[in-house]
Regions:
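Conserved hydrophobic/aromatic beta-strand scaffold that supports enzyme active sites
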Residues: 36-38, 136, 156-160, 196
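Short, structured patches in soluble enzyme cores that scaffold and shape functional sites
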Residues: 124, 139-141, 159-163, 174-176
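Active-site glycine-rich loop that binds ribose-phosphate moieties when present
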Residues: 136-145, 159, 181, 187-192
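Short, conserved beta-strand element in jelly-roll/cupin
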Residues: 146-167, 180
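Double-stranded beta-helix
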Residues: 164-198
């Protein structure tokens, strides 16, 4: 028996149909358990060509906005300030950014976390070069006061456009389950060398 087929909730039933249609049950469970999931391109219903177009659009936008040249995304060296400067508001740069933002699989997971009234509030790139210093642990849920409740107020939905397999690739550090704390990172938890999260 599928609950969604019985009109149980007018707001949840369509979302459950999307979760079923796109085969996202595993990813929903990972979001609930760990606070993160990695959805492969085939599940996102995109191919390597789409990912390449998205990556190239990011690189061209960075070049135009910052007056730099990125000849090869795997070997070019960029100063940190050039890689991250002017990185916001990408939708008007290239249609591929709109396609990535409204990808139905992506939206199904965002709506799972935030509800049907989720609002798209920002888009940016993150370009990491070799030797860039690490960021401290932090929360991207800016402006949410302590005691904001055990609900998701915000989420990040990122497209990975290059290899992201180990520390050499400059990965994002994530604390599994930290979303259950319902608070931002505390000062004594921020430093990667001394954080109690291991």
């Amino acid at each position: 028996m599928d609950m969604k087929d019985h009109g149980v909730s007018e707001h949840v039933d369509p979302l459950m149909e999307d979760i079923d249609r796109y085969g996202l049950y595993k990813h929903v469970v990972e979001l609930e358990a760990y606070g993160i999931t990695v959805v492969p391109p085939e599940t996102m219903r995109v191919d390597e060509e789409f990912v390449g177009r998205l990556r190239n659009a990011i690189l061209r936008a960075c070049e135009r906005r910052n007056g730099v040249e990125i000849t090869d995304y795997q070997t070019s060296v960029l100063a940190r300030e050039d890689a991250g400067r002017n990185s916001w508001d990408l939708l008007e740069e290239d249609e591929i950014f709109v396609d990535a933002a409204i990808n139905p699989v992506n939206l199904a997971l965002v709506r799972w976390l935030l509800g049907g009234s989720a609002v798209f509030s920002g888009q940016t790139w993150i370009i990491k070069g070799e030797g860039y210093p690490s960021l401290n642990l932090h929360s991207d849920a800016h402006g949410i006061p302590p005691g904001g409740g055990h609900i998701a107020h915000t989420c990040n939905a990122s497209w990975l456009c290059s290899d992201y397999e180990d520390a050499a690739d400059g990965p994002t550090v994530f604390v599994p389950g930290s979303h259950h704390h319902a608070r931002a990172t505390l000062p004594h938890e921020e430093d990667l060398a001394t954080t109690p999260f291991k």
